[in-house]
Design a protein with these regions (language model features):
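Gly/Gly-Pro- and Ser/Thr-rich, intrinsically disordered tail segments characteristic of DNA damage-repair
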Residues: 1-203
Length: 203
């Protein structure tokens, strides 16, 4: 979960041995912490151990994940043709609503950005009603890259769990992404290569 990643310093899915605590005893793991360059002062140790006590470690259930993913893909097909739906991972996907937007939201007085937000809210509602899952939506009237950046950098932190980035937002939002690894496609290895080329920011 986003909170789990924030507390334990994880940017993505990891393994039990990557955690700064022992999953059996819930005690701080100095070995893992040092290996990952994490602090080992008493305040941090107490902080990690307090959170470790209330952290649930659950086994993966890939069959169930896949089944729910297929349910969500079928919901997408209510709003776009199969050719406009692009599964990305077990919990992410793209849907191009260009050709169906005016069909679902025909009001000519609304901007395409407003229509996209309204239709995305409808899709969120359908996903929640059918699966019980709260979904987060990144949108763009420009391209999939900006939609993905909107998802990762803004939508996850908004009350509606939606955000729309377009070309006019590049200077204010894209260039303002604080860490290069928060940009889709840039991992730590790529970041090091970019640093070697003298590139230290998205701008």
């Amino acid at each position: 979960s986003p909170l789990f990643k924030k507390i334990f310093g994880k940017s993505n899915v990891g393994r039990a041995y990557d955690l700064p605590f022992d999953i059996k005893t819930r005690k701080f793991s100095y070995y893992n912490a040092r290996k990952q360059g994490l602090p080992t002062d008493s305040d941090y140790v107490r902080y990690i151990e307090d959170w470790a006590q209330v952290t649930l470690i659950v086994p993966p259930r890939m069959d169930e994940y896949i089944a729910v993913n297929m349910e969500i893909q079928r919901i997408f097909q209510n709003y776009g043709s199969p050719e406009d739906i692009y599964p990305y991972s077990i919990d992410e996907g793209f849907i191009d609503l260009t050709s169906s937007l005016n069909y679902f939201i025909p009001d000519k007085n609304l901007s395409r950005k407003d229509k996209l937000d309204m239709l995305s809210a409808r899709i969120q509602r359908d996903i929640w009603r059918q699966t019980g899952i709260y979904s987060t939506v990144g949108m763009s009237n420009a391209n999939p890259l900006l939609a993905k950046l909107a998802l990762d950098n803004e939508a996850k932190h908004t009350p509606t769990m939606r955000a729309n980035w377009s070309y006019q937002d590049v200077e204010e939002k894209v260039w303002a992404i604080p860490k290069m690894t928060d940009f889709w496609g840039i991992g730590r290895r790529m970041e090091k290569r970019l640093h070697a080329l003298g590139i230290f920011s998205i701008k």
